């Protein structure tokens, strides 16, 4: 069974996604520049609520997109976003399979994988790279997002985000510890405050393997190139893998 890492916090995720897309849209658009869209759809693995789907659609006008999101509540928001936008509704096919079981088109123009690779085992990644590599044209990119953490370590609690909706304030806190090797266990807590008092909290945890772009290139048997380096919290590390 494939774990669903996002159900517990899905109701809050759009606040994270709105901030994330502000720092990732530019690098992703750069990474997709020059893609030959005649070779097939763009496959987005881990589409979340659809913010990145919108970026792909703007960067590559007219190309069909297969947006895969296994988390049911996240996929509900993705489907709502696609359905409410006629420009997306005609182009985006939403599917529920996780990366490990995704049924891929025979050929694809490009692949976008944000917030996913560290959740996969090495065996799962190697299998995925092989399936993608045989479907991509020469020069067709796999655009990947990494955590931007150079090595596994303990991360003390810190606040990642604070937003207000109506009379309530929402805070996103996170911490982490090393589990084994380069695997870190991240613990997140959402606090809902009203009048300065916490009225509700939601917590979840997940494991993430720290990986370098060079490691992914070696696993995939593909060339790797950095598009955008992570730095501050919320700023992603984005790279390209190409045949």
What positions do the PLM features span?
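SAM-dependent methyltransferase
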Residues: 149-211
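C-terminal lobe and adjacent flexible extensions of AdoMet/dcAdoMet transferase-like proteins
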Residues: 207-243
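Conserved class I S-adenosyl-L-methionine
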Residues: 1-48
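Conserved beta-strand signature within the Rossmann-like core of class I S-adenosyl-L-methionine
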Residues: 139-146
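A short acidic, Gly/Pro-enriched loop at the edge of an enzyme's catalytic core
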Residues: 103-111
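Class I SAM-dependent methyltransferase SAM/SAH-binding core
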Residues: 50-101
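A short glycine-rich, Lys/Arg-flanked "PGG" loop and its adjoining helix->strand segment in the class I
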Residues: 126-138
């Amino acid at each position: 069974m494939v774990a669903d890492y996002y159900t517990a916090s899905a109701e809050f995720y759009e606040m994270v996604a709105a901030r994330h897309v502000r720092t990732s849209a530019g690098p992703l658009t750069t990474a997709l520049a020059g893609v030959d869209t005649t070779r097939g759809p763009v496959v987005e693995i881990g589409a979340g609520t659809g913010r990145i789907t919108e970026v792909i659609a703007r960067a590559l006008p007219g190309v069909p997109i297969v947006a895969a999101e296994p988390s049911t509540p996240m996929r509900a928001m993705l489907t709502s976003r696609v359905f409410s936008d006629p420009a997306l509704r005609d182009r985006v096919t939403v599917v529920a399979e996780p990366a490990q079981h995704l049924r891929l088109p025979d050929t694809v123009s490009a692949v976008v994988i944000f917030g996913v690779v560290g959740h996969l085992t090495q065996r799962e990644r190697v299998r995925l790279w092989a399936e993608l590599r045989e479907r991509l044209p020469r020069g067709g990119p796999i655009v990947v997002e990494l955590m931007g953490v150079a090595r596994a370590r303990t991360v003390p609690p810190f606040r990642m985000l604070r937003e207000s909706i109506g009379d309530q304030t929402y805070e996103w806190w996170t911490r982490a510890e090393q589990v084994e090797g380069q695997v870190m266990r991240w613990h997140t807590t959402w606090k809902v405050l009203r009048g300065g008092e916490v009225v509700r909290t939601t917590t979840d945890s997940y494991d993430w393997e720290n990986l370098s772009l060079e490691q992914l290139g070696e696993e995939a048997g593909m060339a790797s190139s950095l598009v955008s380096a992570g730095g501050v919290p919320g700023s992603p590390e984005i790279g390209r893998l190409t045949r």
